[in-house]
């Protein structure tokens, strides 16, 4: 690209999908960018189901995305040419009334961190699983679907290398890349960092990986169930809290108790689409219950230790989860939990989509973390989305709609 200073101004919609504009200026000064208010009214398939509530009363007047001079991320190397920008910035959204937008979950996560002592010291790592899809006359050269079959990456090496180069150029620190349980299923593990930064990295990494894949004639998808006969893709979250060395068990127990609250009350935030519910019927390294183990991969929660620091892995979120909303609810759960809490007997997870929507709407945890208006709007959107999902005649038809956005 030219040497012109251009900033890609982004914001996450209600589903954690990147929306934005390329602005012809640098990111050293504050900027406000207008967008149609209808963007937050859309379900995951793109239907404006909340348009009468969020856009029509205001004549579809603009929402505004505000970026401060501290929000910019300078881009380097491959990322600059890929995105056509010298910097990237994620802004805060105000609705047409000038108020913080109720479905800006990034802002809600930031607010929780600001008002809650100690949560900022939490560190979160993430593992992003995804599929690459494309026509390839060399498919006969691919190995069978075995985890860590690194020889299989050779067919996609240029695309995957460009993904990693772009992540480097955007300042997104990754730890490792591996093949997952299926041919053309991969995982990128992101380094531990603070909660808001990690949510931003997940958000940006998804957009970057999809953009890179498209430049190679491939589709990178983070939908949860790409095929009913193939392993689902997940978003594993590794959470560690401040630990002074006095009681390692108490630290991990508080994290796990908080996660258990989310599984019981706000499973919708971890498995947010009807497509993601098909994972219940696929044998994979995940659990259908709210169980916990010491290192075991077949449980929903997995207690681990790294460099003397206890952490807990939440293995349940599917790859389509909104990172801001999922991390927000995990932190809210930790905030309400205590190390002295008794960990209850495991219960089966309720994969019924309608039940999850009702549970979220009635959740004390969700209403402690989010304004009532936000909870009601999100539940309403998901109910409309469930109705739209039922209109797809086949799994493949719904999958096709999701591939366009996730």
Walk through the language-model features, giving the residues of each.
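ATP/Mg2+-dependent ligation/transfer catalytic cores
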Residues: 1-179, 348-406
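C-terminal accessory/tail domains of diverse enzymes
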Residues: 3, 8-19, 30-34, 38-41, ...
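Broad gene-expression machinery/nucleic-acid interaction feature
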Residues: 6, 18, 86-90, 125-129, ...
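Residue-level recognition of well-ordered beta-strand positions that form the cores
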Residues: 10, 92, 129-131, 189-191, ...
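A generic structural motif
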Residues: 13-15, 94-100, 152, 192-198, ...
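Short, ordered beta-strand-loop transition motifs
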Residues: 81-84, 179-182, 303-309
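Helix-rich catalytic cores of soluble enzyme domains
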Residues: 117, 129-227, 231-245
